[in-house]
Amino acid sequence: METPELWQFTSSHFNEKARWALDFKRIPHVRHSLIPGFHVPVVKRMTGKTTVPVLKLNGAAISDSSRIIEALERAYPEPALYPADADQRSRALDLEDYFDEELGPYIRRWIFHVILPHPEFVRAAFVSHASKGAQLAHRALSPLFGAIMKRQMNINPISAEAARGKTMAAMDRLAKELRPSGYLVGDRFTVADLTAAALLSPLVRPPEFPYKAALPLPEPLAKIRDSLSTHPAYRWTLQAYAQHRGESAEVAGATNLSRSKVDASRAATTER
């Protein structure tokens, strides 16, 4: 069996979801870290799409974090992220879908509204792994990236406030859905827990998150984080990371890819 290869953005919650599944299952894999915008020709050649993460598994290029986990469950069934019990499995997949649709896009919009006025932090979070040349190119293009991201992701004060509300609603639901075991389904960690925790990671910033920005959080984001630190979903996310994030299963051979030609117009809607 070929070593799986993951094409990713380092600081992305949907990418973290796929990455965590690989690590949880202890699957040795190679990671290719991309820069938003610069990633387009690389990913489009593999899938015909422009979204990451993309997993190359047994010759197939799979996009979408949920489809990646589904493929990993078939190829590497243990340790399982899908419950064996049919009712529990249905609940786990329903919750995965809920957090994918009702949390993932909205927490992203809210967080980007907060951090885009701080381009140095954005570069530290998304580009610090890249070559110096790629970092310089991104720096030169950062005003363009910011404007395009605002337009394509519909980022403005009104939409950001609505996204904040959706994020809070998802956090409240997470707290209500927790079983007495402390998990969302049954008495063990499943795809539902992994999805909820990974998608909350941009806000919670767990210490176990594998890629940390080289700069401190911008003050507005730090204040938001502090204000939510007593929320049950926030505390639960920290616990989920502490108990289940584990060590990386990445193996040698990873690359940091960039291209001189960047499609900035596609930089904003590129993860799922």
Q: Where in this protein do the model-derived segments appear?
A:
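GST-like domain detector, emphasizing the conserved glutathione-binding G-site
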Residues: 1-134, 244-251, 256-267, 271-272
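Short runs of predominantly hydrophobic/aromatic residues within well-ordered alpha helices
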Residues: 65, 95, 104, 191-192, ...
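A non-catalytic, amphipathic alpha-helix used as a structural packing/dimerization or gating element
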Residues: 87, 91-94, 162-169, 173, ...
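Short His-centered aromatic/hydrophobic patch
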Residues: 199-247
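Conserved aromatic-histidine-acidic binding/catalytic patches
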Residues: 6-10, 56-60, 95, 99, ...
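Short amphipathic alpha-helical segments at helix-loop
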Residues: 155, 159, 221, 225, ...
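C-terminal/domain-terminus segments
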Residues: 190, 211-219, 254-266
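GST-like fold's C-terminal all-alpha helical module
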Residues: 104-214
